[in-house]
């Protein structure tokens, strides 16, 4: 499958599947995975980028291990809402991944996710060296948590309307 919208996620997930969040960096891929209730994002170890074929193999194995049904990928928009070069790189990554997996990708605006992740790690008194190792997975968790919160609000609005 190609890409999907956040509203489609509940229909795309099979029982027992989770949602993954990705934060693409130039040197690492941050990964986070939801719980089965789609309430909480849990950071996973970062994937050190080597070359695409290896990166894809490692990522797909991690997604299989966590029984992922949908991939939420951070779209690094500029602060003014325009698409910059990193947006193009993210879209290219998804296009290259699509032939390798049937999992749908959902783009999610990730503005300020890395800033929020760094502040959270500083607040937890994580040393500068360890922050560098964890920042992309923490950012992936922020991206995913934002999407999970949106899904929760959508479910609540559907319940209130019904």
Swiss-Prot record:
InterPro entries attached to this UniProt entry: RNaseH-like_sf, YqgF, YqgF/RNaseH-like_dom, YqgF/RNaseH-like_dom_sf
A Pfam family of this chain: RuvX
EC code: 3.1.-.-
GO cellular component, one term: cytosol
MF GO annotations: nuclease activity
Keywords: Cytoplasm, Hydrolase, Nuclease, Ribosome biogenesis
Family annotation (SMART domains): YqgFc
Statement: the UniProt record of this protein carries the keyword Hydrolase: yes
Top class in the EC scheme: hydrolase
Cellular location(s): Cytoplasm
GO biological process: rRNA 5'-end processing
Known role: Could be a nuclease involved in processing of the 5'-end of pre-16S rRNA.
Family, as annotated: Belongs to the YqgF nuclease family.
Name of the protein this chain belongs to: Putative pre-16S rRNA nuclease
Organism: Brucella abortus (strain 2308)
């Amino acid at each position: 499958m190609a890409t999907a919208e956040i509203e489609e996620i509940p229909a795309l997930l099979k029982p027992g599947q989770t949602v993954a969040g990705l934060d693409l960096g130039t040197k690492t891929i941050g990964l986070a995975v939801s719980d089965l209730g789609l309430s909480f994002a849990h950071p996973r170890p970062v994937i050190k980028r080597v070359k695409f074929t290896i990166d894809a193999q490692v990522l797909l194995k991690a997604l299989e291990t966590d029984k992922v049904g949908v991939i939420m990928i951070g779209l690094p928009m500029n602060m003014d809402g325009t698409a910059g070069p990193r947006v193009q790189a993210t879209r290219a990554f998804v296009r290259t991944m699509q032939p390798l997996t049937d999992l749908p990708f959902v783009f999610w605006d990730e503005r300020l996710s890395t800033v929020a992740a760094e502040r959270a790690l500083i607040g937890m008194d994580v040393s500068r060296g360890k922050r560098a190792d964890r920042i992309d997975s923490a950012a992936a968790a922020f991206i995913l948590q934002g999407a999970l919160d949106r899904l929760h609000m959508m479910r609540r609005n559907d319940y209130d309307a019904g």
